[in-house]
Amino acid sequence: MPNFSGNWKIIRSENFEDLLKVLGVNVMLRKIAVAAASKPAVEIKQEGDTFYIKTSTTVRTTEINFKIGEEFEEQTVDGRPCKSLVKWESENKMVCEQRLLKGEGPKTSWTRELTNDGELILTMTADDIVCTRVYVRE
């Protein structure tokens, strides 16, 4: 079983602003979010299939607790409440499908994958826009 536990720092990000744009975040808030999210602190604690993930930026801190295969509530990257379900796609990759609790919006999901060279790859998808963020352990 992969070990996602640790404190992670970002080394690369692609399409984050495009993702926020397709989610309907206005230009001013996008600029603030992109600047704040350029150096997030990510802490992951894992016990088997149970996860705690805390992501801290200068603007916002989010915390989620979940178990693989059990639905839970969280927020989409733009802050809308949703139900999420995480499953293992492969030995080192988890996939989360999100369903908005109310209203309409783009179909959103995320994945987290550990690579053989120790990187954590987070992908966030809204409709056909994919944002990729790559982290290494601190």
From Swiss-Prot:
Gene3D superfamilies, sorted: 2.40.128.20
Keywords, sorted A to Z: Cytoplasm, Endoplasmic reticulum, Isopeptide bond, Nucleus, Retinol-binding, Transport, Ubl conjugation, Vitamin A
Residues noted as binding all-trans-retinoate in the record, renumbered to the chain: R133, V134, Y135
Modification(s) after translation: Sumoylated in response to retinoic acid binding, sumoylation is critical for dissociation from ER and subsequent nuclear translocation.
One annotated GO molecular function: retinoic acid binding
GO terms, biological process: fatty acid transport
The protein's name in its UniProt record: Cellular retinoic acid-binding protein 2
Originating species: Bos taurus
Lineage: Eukaryota, Metazoa, Chordata, Craniata, Vertebrata
